[in-house]
A protein has these predicted regions:
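Extracellular/periplasmic helix-exit of transmembrane alpha-helices
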Residues: 108-122, 166, 274-297, 357-399
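Flexible loop linkers connecting adjacent transmembrane helices
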Residues: 1-4, 37-43, 70-89, 114-137, ...
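Loop-to-transmembrane helix boundary motifs in multi-pass membrane proteins
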Residues: 6-21, 181-190, 227-244, 248, ...
Length: 521
């Protein structure tokens, strides 16, 4: 293993990406409050005044995914006809799923229902059964097939250019060649890649900003240590080094094996909470109701902007999530494209949407309803039995991270389960951010053939950049401006993703015409 060998770095993309990120990070450290005020104003404008554009964009992505599954191009293979998949189906599913979760899924999966319980959407009454069902359903909706459809469409566009058109460049800009032509090789293409990379780095700090306090709280609960900023910095540093060493082993030996371990550990923790956490019947029954609520109200939940009631609920939650997924979509698309050679378009889209959604739903169903079951048993003992904990009281008085930790610790064998949960949170962040660092390195690589990976020092470098920026911004309480910047970047990035989709359909139609309609079933 030689970390310093591998494909050459494209300095025209690499250097500006690093420079812009570091410049803005320093600016946010120097002016955290002023930066946040200005960026928040822009963010509010984009979610309140332009939020409807995110709504229509995500629905268009969902419709495109359905077309790719059901339409005439579904059997088209991503690669040559003789190509076999590079990874087993189990490993492929695990690598897709763990790439997008990180610790954010553990965080929101356990606690998001509280926000919707306290401020119900769609006009439901606070504390009512409708509020409870919507509280459980909305998290699953936000992390469900709409988001994964967006990832899938972008991945197919990139994979087609990479595996079918045989362009040895794994970048977002390359997927726009069908529309932009040779301009992709000039400043326009470089700008697309640099812009996407910056937005992604901001999105990663959002995940670290959520996961670090949660993991630190878990360590403190287990060890009795005081929750301090120093301990949080140690957590981020350990994360960063683990991500870097995983990347040094490459895609097959490092990322795949870590993803497999993550899957086994996740289902171990989730399985214990489901079957032995004391709320089995409540979890399965309430999950069933939540799934029904989603399917019954999918169009309402998707299109609701609350223009009359003006609660801002769709803007603060649904639009925010759609913007977050837009920021992550290119990275997920590049990653899924890289690992999907030899699979058909239908397999890739259906696999991403179905298994990704199912995995996310399992986390929300078990973690969220376990937490809700604890709360209902504590506040309504005449109707609910089992382990009890006033989770909302802890949420209000101690904080979100401690509400999550105490919910896990309230299960039987609480210390053991919490230790497993902390390990799961750690590994989930490692697998998620490893994927991001791998993607950033791929985009900065001048030429990346199908059988190649980015130089390992390149991937390791981006892991260090992500960790160093997170530590620096945490020290100076400047994480939020960079996080907000990434969401602001989502609006123009939507335009790029539209170009990507249009370019793909243009290329595949032209190839189909040349082959005399070979894409027909």
């Amino acid at each position: 293993m030689d970390a310093f060998k591998g494909p050459k770095v494209d300095k025209v993309v690499f250097i500006p990406s690093v420079a812009i990120t570091l410049f803005l990070a320093v600016y946010f450290v120097i002016n955290p409050e002023d930066s946040l005020v200005k960026l928040s104003a822009v963010f509010t404008y984009m979610t309140d005044d332009l939020g409807w554009t995110y709504v229509w964009f995500t629905l268009a992505a969902f419709g495109s995914a359905l077309y790719l599954i059901l339409g005439k191009y579904g059997k088209r293979k991503l690669g040559n006809e003789q190509d076999k998949p590079d990874f087993s189906t189990f490993s492929w599913i695990g690598m897709i799923f763990t790439a997008s979760t990180g610790s954010s899924l553990l965080y929101w999966g356990m606690i998001e229902w509280i926000y919707f319980w306290k401020s119900p959407p769609l006009g439901a009454e606070v504390g009512s059964w409708q509020a409870a069902e919507l509280a459980s359903a909305y998290g699953m909706f936000h992390w469900g097939f709409t988001a994964w459809a967006m990832y899938a469409v972008v991945s197919i566009a990139i994979a087609y250019a990479y595996h079918v058109k045989k362009k040895p460049i794994l970048r977002l800009s390359e997927a726009t060649r069908g529309i932009l032509g040779d301009r992709v090789d000039g400043p326009i293409g470089k700008a697309i890649d640099i812009f996407f990379m910056f937005g992604l780095i901001g999105g990663v700090t959002t995940s670290m900003g959520l996961g670090t306090p949660m993991l630190t709280a878990g360590i403190c609960k287990l060890t009795g240590l005081e929750h301090t900023q120093t301990l949080e910095i140690i957590v981020i540093t350990t994360w960063t080094l683990s991500i870097g060493f995983t990347l040094l082993f490459g895609l097959e030996r490092g990322i795949r094996r870590m993803s497999d371990l993550n899957i086994y550990l996740a289902f171990g923790v989730l399985g214990f909470l489901l079957f032995f956490g004391g709320h089995f019947l409540f979890i399965v029954n309430h999950t069933t109701s939540a799934v029904g609520t989603i399917f019954q109200n999918f169009m309402i939940m998707s299109f609701w902007t609350d223009a009359v009631g003006q609660s801002k609920h769709p803007q603060w939650w649904t639009v925010f999530y759609w913007a977050w997924w837009v920021v992550y979509a290119p990275a997920m698309g590049l990653y899924i494209a890289k690992i999907s050679r030899g699979r058909t378009i239908r397999q890739t889209v259906l696999g991403s949407v179905f298994w990704g959604t199912l995995g996310s739903w399992i986390f929300f169903a078990i973690l969220g309803n376990h937490s809700m079951g604890l709360y209902l048993s504590a506040t309504r003992p005449e109707s609910f039995s089992g382990p009890a904990l006033n989770v909302i009281e802890i949420f209000d008085n101690v904080g979100v991270s401690w509400a999550i930790v105490e919910s896990v610790a309230a299960a039987p064998l609480g210390s053991i389960v919490l230790a497993a949960f902390v390990l799961l949170a750690f590994i989930s962040m490692v697998t998620g951010q490893t994927t991001i660092a791998f993607t950033l390195a791929s985009v900065c690589t001048k030429e990346l053939k199908e059988e190649d990976e980015p130089a390992r020092w390149n991937s390791f470098f981006w892991a260090l950049v992500l960790g160093s920026i997170s530590v620096s911004l945490l020290l100076f309480n400047a994480l939020q401006p960079l996080q907000t910047t990434s969401i602001v970047a989502a609006f123009p990035l939507m335009g790029v993703l539209i170009l990507v989709a249009l370019s793909f359909f243009k290329m595949i139609r032209e190839d189909d015409a040349k082959a005399g309609g070979a894409g027909e079933e």
